[in-house]
Amino acid sequence: MKGEHSVMPDAAVAYYHLPGLFEFYDFYRAFLPLYRRHREYFYDWCDIASLYGVPEGCLWGGGRMGSGNCDPRDVLALTREYGISARLTFSNSLLRPEHLADRGCNRLCRLFAGSAGPQNGVIVHSELLLEHLRSVYPELYLVSSTTKVLTDFAALRQELERPEFRCVVPDFRLNRAFDRLDTLPQALRDKVEFLCNECCDFGCRERRACYEAVSRENLGEGGPVHRCASPDAAGGYRFSRAMENPGFIGVDDIRSTYLPKGFSQFKIEGRSLGSALLLEFLLHYLTRPPYHIHVREALYLDNGLDLF
């Protein structure tokens, strides 16, 4: 694709962080061989940097409820084979000291920390968990979770300046705050990981409460039931509606605006949305339009996949 977008530096690469490490394991087992075998189908200015998620029943989980039940060893074998980092989404914001001893989550960390191949990481919210991970599993890199709802730019910059984080995912409402993003030095721009396809109402004031409700559910604790007040909540996630969100970052935005400005990390949400929507995300963000039908056909004809 070099030469088609002269504003983009030749060496610029967009790195995608994709949802469903466990939740969409079967999907990626079909998609990644296609991605490797037919690179001509996909943009040459982007690559898959990581897959993120958690299996169901993870105490430390947050953001969304994990739903995958595949063997973590199979997951790691897949990511190793394709040179992709695996990230555990341990973004529960309500952890207490007694939760740090959870056997299942520690077992996952040991497995991911000891895996050969690309370095694996953890998406984290709790400072308590952060210190535990740094102390016990220093082999894992850390990502600051969007569940912190960093809407204040000064707070975002402070988070970016913390050396313990490889990347920081700000709230999507800062996605187009270029008057402030442009003030960041390149070292900090390299750490900003934009959440591209959020469908949440841009004016929502309950985002933190929504994430806390998920954290309580993962802990098996009672508390206020969060009910989304968005007028579109009943319709669920719609990619077409996400595209109309003021914070949406599409493929053309990445090529023409973010990469030329020195931003290269892009997170795609969708762990709880189903593999049919995941396919639409991958078509939009990774796939050259003439080859959309080729990718669709290859995956539709895979009898092992349940896309709907």
Where are the regions that the model predicts?
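Active-site pocket-lining/capping segments in soluble small-molecule metabolic enzymes
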Residues: 2-155, 159, 164-308
